[in-house]
C-alpha cells in the first residue's frame, strides 16, 4: 500500500475540496503526490493555495439577467478561483451594485472541470436520445455537417436549414457567429424572446417598443413597489438587495403572488389572488383610482390615446380620412374643450409616415428608429369625457366619444372591487386599500415577472398594468413606471450586434417565428383552444397576408437544425409532439455545447464549445447599464473551440463541400442575391479582418452609438457604462429609467396614435373582445383539477446548473413538484413520493414536495430539469402545449408588425391544468 504524508494528502484533496475553486494541480498531477514529501509546516500550503499567475475578466454567458462581472484566477493553466470583481461605478445617492453574483455563478468552474463537459466532437451511433456516441475528429464532424448543408441548399432550399441561438445580450459574439453563417447561406434563424413567453407583448401593443425597463438601482428611488408575479429574491438574486435597502429608506413593498414565496416573506403586504386572475385585480384598482379621481388627467390627455375620439357607429377611431377629402387614415382626432371643435393632435402616425413605419430590423423598433416631432398639446385642452357630434365627409352626422369615456363606463360597471373579489379571492377592502396606496405614493412602481407573463392573455393583463401607470402618471419618472424583468432580452448596443450578425442588413435575413414554426412542424394543430377561438383561421390569414412568416417556404419541412447556446428541446412546449412529429423530419440535428444537455442527447452531431472562461465575449443586461467582458483565463480545454471559431471552421468546410459538389453559387430569388458558397470564409471574416473573436467584439462596440469609443482594454480595466440607451438619455450618476424621451422630451411614442395606445381598433382585437384592457380568464381547455405552474428555480438558470452537483446538494438532489399539504392529504400523497402528473398533452413522473406556501388547487414544478435527471418520464414542458393567441398574429397595423422578438406569438405555459396521483411502478435508484 502506498503511504501518503499529511502534506501529500492535503495537496491531493485540495484538488476537489476548494469549494468555489480548484487546486492549481490537475487531478492527473494530483495522483503523483502519493510519494513522500518532507513535512515543512502548513503555512506555505495556505499561502500557495491562494497564489496565481494570471488574473482575467470573467462573466457567465448563460440566459441570466445578472451580467455579474467577475475576476478569474488561474495558475499553471488551471482556473483556481472565481470571485465578484466589485468594480461597477456607483450611482449618486444610491446603494452600490457591488458585489454582483449568486450561488449559480460561483459554480461556473463546475462546468469546466466536471463530468458534464464535452471534450471532443461526437457523432451519434445509436437512436436519438439513446446516448450512444463515437468520438470524431473536427474535420470529420464539420465535413458531415457541411455536406448536409450544401446538399440541403441544392436539393431543397436554403431555408430548410434552421439555426437557433437565444439571448444575444449575454454573449453577442457567440450569438452573431451562427447568425452570420445563416445570413450568408440563406438559412432561417429563430425568435426566442416570444417563444420563451418572456416578451411583454402588451407593452409592444401599448408603447410601440420591443420593451424597455429601468435598471434595478432605480428601485431605490421608488416610494411604493408592487412585485407583481415577480420573485426577485429567488430569480434576481444580485439585485434583490435594492428592495431591502429601499425598505430601510421608507419604501413600502407589496407582493402579488399566489404562493407565499421567498420574496413575499420579506414585503410589507402580501396579496395572493387565484392564479391567472391578476387582470381582474388590476382593473379593479383602476376602478378605485378613476372613481376617487386619483388619476393624473394631464398625463392621460398628453401621453395616452384616452382623449382620442371613437366613432359610436363603427367603434373605430375617428380618422382624418373620415372627415376630410384626401385625409390620412393614420391621423386621429380629439375634442378641444376650449374651441368646441375636433382637432388633430401632433405626433400621429400619419404625420411622418416615412419615418413612422417600423423598420425592417432585428428586434423591431429600438433606439434610433423612433419618430420625430413632438406631442405637447400647446393650447389644446382635450376632453376625456363626453359625447360629441361630427359630420363626416359624406355629410352623415355621427356620435363620437373619447376612449376614456368608453373605458370608464366599462370599468365602472364590470370591474368593481366587489366583483373582483369574487374572481380573485382578494377582499374588496384590500383591493381598495392597495389602489389608494399605489395611486397616492409618488413615485410608485410595478415590477412584473414571469408569473404575469406566461399566460394566453398576458398581453391584455400587461395593458391593464400599463393603464395603472398611465392613470397615476408614473411612467418616465425615476422610481416609477412598469418594469418587466422576464428573460435576458436587451442588447443595448443593438446596431453593433446587427452589423455583425446580419452584415447585408436584416432585410436580407430570413427570420422564423419559433412558436409558429413549432406549432406547424411539430403538428400540434390538434391543440384546439375552445369552440370560440379558431386559431387556424387567424393563422391562415396571417400567412396569406404575409403578416407572419411560414418557414421553410412553399410548405417544405425543415431538414437541418443547428442549435447552439440554447437547450431548445428541453425548453420546448409541446414536447411530445416535437419528438414524435418534428424530430423525424430533421435529417441532421447539430448541437454546439459545453456540456451534454437534453438537446445534445437527441442530436446527431455534438461539437464541444469553449467555456465562458476560455473565450472572449461581451456581456450586458437590462438590469444595469454597464458592459462586462469575459476573456480567456486558459486556452479552450480538450478539443473545444469558441463559437466564433467553430462557425468560421464550418464555413471553410462548406466552401470545400461546395467546390467538391460543383455547387459554388446559387441565386436566392427572394433577395435577388447570388450567394457564393465558395467564398464563405472571406464573407464571414470580412476578408480576414474578423478572423479573431476579439476583433468581432470590438466591431460590435464600434458600430453602436451606445458603445462607440469603448475598447476591450477599457473593459479589462473595469465595466464601462453605456453612453446612450433606448428610450431615455443616459445621465451620469443617475439610474436609467425608460420612456423619458416621450414623457419628458415630448417625443411621439412609436405607436399608431403617437401616444401610449390603449384602444386597438383592429378586427382581431374586436373579435377577441380586447380592443380595450379587459379581464380575460385563463384558458381551461384541459379539464383537470390542478393548475400547473413552472416557476424559475433558485438553484438553476433555466436548465443550466440543473445538473451541477454543487447546486443539487442545496436541494433535494433532483426535480420535484410542489403541492399544498391539504391537496396532498386528499390524494393520499406523502412528501418525496413518486407521482404521475398528466393531461392530454403529456405526462411527467417525478418526486413530490409538500410545501405549505403553495396554494390549494395549484402544483408547481421548477422550470426545465434535464430530461435525464431523476425523471421516470417527461419533464416540466411535457404537459405544456403550444398555443397561439390570435392578437399576436396581427400585422400591418401601425406599430403592430412582425419583427423578430418584437411582435409575434409567445409561450403560454401557465394556461395548463393537470391531474396527479401517486405513482405505483418501478422507480430508479435516485435521491
Swiss-Prot record:
[4Fe-4S] cluster binds at residues 60, 64, 68, 102. Predicted to be exported by the Tat system. The position of the signal peptide cleavage has not been experimentally proven. The keyword Nucleotidyltransferase does not apply. Belongs to the prokaryotic molybdopterin-containing oxidoreductase family. Transmembrane segments: none annotated. Binds 1 [4Fe-4S] cluster. Binds 1 molybdenum-bis(molybdopterin guanine dinucleotide) (Mo-bis-MGD) cofactor per subunit. Heterotrimer of alpha, beta and gamma subunits. It is an enzyme of class 1 (oxidoreductase). This is Perchlorate reductase subunit alpha. It holds the Pfam family Molydop_binding. Its EC number is 1.97.1.-. It is found in: Periplasm. SUPFAM superfamilies: ADC-like, Formate dehydrogenase/DMSO reductase, domains 1-3. Residues 53-116 form the 4Fe-4S Mo/W bis-MGD-type domain. Keywords: 4Fe-4S, Iron, Iron-sulfur, Metal-binding, Molybdenum, Oxidoreductase, Periplasm, Signal. Its cofactor is [4Fe-4S] cluster; Mo-bis(molybdopterin guanine dinucleotide). GO terms for biological process: cellular respiration. Its main location: periplasm. It comes from the Bacteria. Mo-bis(molybdopterin guanine dinucleotide) binds at residue 198. Component of the perchlorate reductase that catalyzes the reduction of perchlorate to chlorite and allows anaerobic growth on perchlorate as the sole electron acceptor. Is probably also able to reduce chlorate to chlorite. The alpha subunit is likely the catalytic subunit. GO terms for cellular component: membrane; oxidoreductase complex; periplasmic space. NCBIfam families: DMSO_red_II_alp. Has potential use in bioremediation of waste sites contaminated with perchlorate, a common component of solid rocket fuel which is a widespread environmental contaminant in water systems in the United States. Induction: Transcription of pcrA occurs only under anaerobic (per)chlorate-reducing conditions. The presence of oxygen completely inhibits pcrA expression regardless of the presence of perchlorate, chlorate, or nitrate. One of its GO terms (molecular function) is metal ion binding.
Amino acid at each position: 500500500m502506498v503511504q501518503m504524508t499529511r502534506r501529500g494528502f492535503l495537496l491531493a484533496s485540495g484538488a476537489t475540496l476548494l469549494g468555489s475553486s480548484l487546486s492549481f494541480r490537475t487531478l492527473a498531477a494530483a495522483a503523483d503526490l502519493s510519494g513522500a514529501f518532507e513535512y515543512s509546516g502548513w503555512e506555505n500550503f495556505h499561502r500557495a493555495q491562494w497564489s496565481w499567475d494570471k488574473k482575467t475578466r470573467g462573466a457567465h454567458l448563460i440566459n441570466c439577467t445578472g451580467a455579474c462581472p467577475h475576476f478569474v484566477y488561474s495558475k499553471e493553466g488551471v482556473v483556481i478561483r472565481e470571485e465578484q470583481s466589485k468594480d461597477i461605478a456607483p450611482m449618486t445617492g444610491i446603494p452600490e451594485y457591488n458585489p454582483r453574483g449568486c450561488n449559480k455563478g460561483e459554480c461556473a468552474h463546475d462546468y469546466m472541470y466536471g463530468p458534464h463537459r464535452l471534450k471532443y466532437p461526437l457523432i451519434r451511433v445509436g437512436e436519438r436520445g439513446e446516448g450512444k456516441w463515437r468520438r470524431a475528429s473536427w474535420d470529420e464532424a464539420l465535413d458531415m455537417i457541411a455536406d448536409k448543408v450544401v446538399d440541403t441548399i441544392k436539393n431543397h432550399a436554403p431555408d430548410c436549414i434552421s439555426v437557433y441561438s437565444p439571448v444575444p445580450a449575454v454573449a453577442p459574439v457567440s450569438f452573431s457567429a451562427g447568425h452570420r453563417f445563416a445570413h450568408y447561406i440563406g438559412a432561417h434563424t429563430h425568435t426566442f424572446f416570444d417563444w420563451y413567453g418572456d416578451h411583454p407583448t402588451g407593452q409592444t401593443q401599448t408603447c410601440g417598443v420591443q420593451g424597455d425597463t429601468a435598471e434595478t438601482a432605480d428601485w431605490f428611488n421608488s416610494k411604493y413597489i408592487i412585485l407583481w408575479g415577480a420573485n426577485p429574491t429567488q430569480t434576481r438574486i444580485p439585485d434583490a438587495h435594492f428592495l431591502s435597502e429601499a425598505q430601510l429608506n421608507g419604501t413600502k413593498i407589496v407582493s402579488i403572488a399566489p404562493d407565499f414565496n421567498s420574496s413575499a416573506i420579506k414585503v410589507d403586504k402580501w396579496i395572493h389572488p387565484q392564479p391567472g386572475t391578476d387582470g381582474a385585480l388590476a382593473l379593479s384598482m383602476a376602478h378605485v383610482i378613476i372613481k376617487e379621481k386619483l388619476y393624473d388627467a394631464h398625463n392621460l390627455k398628453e401621453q395616452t390615446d384616452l382623449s382620442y375620439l371613437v366613432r359610436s357607429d363603427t367603434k373605430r377611431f375617428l380618422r382624418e380620412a373620415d372627415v376630410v377629402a384626401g385625409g390620412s387614415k393614420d391621423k386621429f382626432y380629439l375634442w378641444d374643450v376650449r374651441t368646441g371643435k375636433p382637432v388633430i393632435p401632433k405626433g400621429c402616425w400619419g404625420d411622418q409616415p416615412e419615418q413612422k413605419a417600423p423598420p425592417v430590423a432585428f428586434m423591431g423598433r429600438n433606439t434610433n428608429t423612433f419618430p420625430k416631432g413632438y406631442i405637447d398639446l400647446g393650447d389644446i385642452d382635450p376632453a376625456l369625457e363626453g359625447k360629441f357630434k361630427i359630420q363626416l365627409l359624406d355629410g352623415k352626422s355621427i356620435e363620437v366619444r373619447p376612449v376614456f369615456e368608453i373605458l370608464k363606463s366599462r370599468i365602472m360597471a364590470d370591474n368593481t372591487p366587489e366583483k373582483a373579489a369574487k374572481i380573485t379571492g382578494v377582499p374588496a377592502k384590500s383591493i381598495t386599500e392597495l389602489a389608494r396606496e399605489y395611486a397616492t405614493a409618488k413615485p410608485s412602481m410595478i415590477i412584473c415577472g414571469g408569473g404575469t407573463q406566461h399566460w394566453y392573455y398576458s398581453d391584455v393583463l400587461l395593458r391593464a398594468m400599463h393603464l395603472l401607470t398611465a392613470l397615476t402618471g408614473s411612467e418616465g419618472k425615476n422610481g416609477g413606471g412598469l418594469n418587466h424583468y422576464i428573460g435576458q432580452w436587451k442588447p443595448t448596443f443593438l446596431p453593433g450586434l446587427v452589423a455583425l450578425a446580419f452584415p447585408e442588413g436584416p432585410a436580407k435575413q430570413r427570420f422564423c417565428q419559433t412558436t409558429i414554426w413549432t406549432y406547424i412542424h411539430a403538428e400540434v394543430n390538434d391543440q384546439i383552444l375552445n369552440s370560440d377561438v379558431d386559431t387556424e383561421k387567424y393563422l391562415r390569414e396571417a400567412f396569406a397576408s404575409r403578416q407572419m412568416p411560414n418557414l421553410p417556404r412553399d410548405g417544405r419541412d425543415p431538414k437541418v437544425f443547428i442549435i447552439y447556446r440554447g437547450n431548445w428541446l428541453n425548453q420546448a412546449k409541446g414536447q411530445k409532439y416535437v419528438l414524435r412529429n418534428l424530430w423525424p423530419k430533421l435529417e441532421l440535428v447539430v448541437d454546439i455545447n459545453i456540456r451534454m444537455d437534453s438537446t445534445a442527447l437527441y442530436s446527431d452531431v455534438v461539437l464541444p464549445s469553449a467555456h465562458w472562461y476560455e473565450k472572449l465575449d461581451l456581456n450586458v443586461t437590462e438590469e444595469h447599464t454597464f458592459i462586462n467582458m469575459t476573456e480567456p483565463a486558459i486556452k479552450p480545454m480538450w478539443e473545444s473551440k469558441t463559437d466564433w471559431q467553430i462557425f468560421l471552421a464550418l464555413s471553410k468546410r462548406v466552401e470545400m463541400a461546395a467546390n467538391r459538389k460543383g455547387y459554388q453559387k446559387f441565386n436566392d430569388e427572394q433577395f435577388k442575391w447570388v450567394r457564393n458558397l465558395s467564398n464563405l470564409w472571406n464573407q464571414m471574416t470580412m476578408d480576414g479582418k474578423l478572423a479573431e473573436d476579439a476583433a468581432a467584439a470590438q466591431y460590435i462596440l464600434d458600430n453602436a452609438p451606445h458603445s462607440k469609443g469603448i475598447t476591450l482594454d477599457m473593459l479589462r480595466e473595469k465595466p464601462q457604462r453605456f453612453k446612450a440607451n433606448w428610450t431615455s438619455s443616459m445621465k451620469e450618476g443617475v439610474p436609467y429609467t425608460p420612456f423619458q424621451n416621450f414623457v419628458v422630451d415630448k417625443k411621439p411614442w412609436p405607436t399608431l396614435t403617437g401616444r401610449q395606445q390603449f384602444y386597438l381598433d383592429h378586427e382581431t382585437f374586436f373579435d377577441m373582445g380586447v380592443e380595450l384592457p379587459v379581464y380575460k380568464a385563463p384558458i381551461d381547455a384541459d379539464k383537470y383539477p390542478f393548475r400547473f405552474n413552472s416557476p424559475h428555480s433558485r438553484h438553476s438558470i433555466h436548465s443550466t446548473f440543473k445538473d451541477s452537483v454543487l447546486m443539487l446538494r442545496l436541494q433535494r438532489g433532483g426535480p420535484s413538484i410542489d403541492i399544498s399539504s391539504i391537496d396532498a392529504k386528499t390524494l393520499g400523497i406523502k412528501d418525496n413520493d413518486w407521482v404521475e402528473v398528466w393531461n392530454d398533452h403529456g405526462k411527467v413522473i417525478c418526486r413530490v414536495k409538500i410545501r405549505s406556501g403553495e396554494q390549494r388547487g395549484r402544483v408547481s414544478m421548477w422550470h426545465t430539469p434535464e430530461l435525464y435527471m431523476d425523471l421516470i418520464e417527461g419533464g416540466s414542458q411535457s404537459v405544456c402545449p403550444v398555443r397561439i393567441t390570435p392578437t399576436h398574429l396581427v400585422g400591418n397595423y401601425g406599430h403592430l408588425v412582425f419583427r423578430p422578438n418584437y411582435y409575434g406569438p409567445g409561450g403560454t405555459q401557465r394556461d395548463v391544468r393537470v391531474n396527479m396521483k401517486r405513482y405505483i411502478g418501478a422507480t430508479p435508484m435516485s435521491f
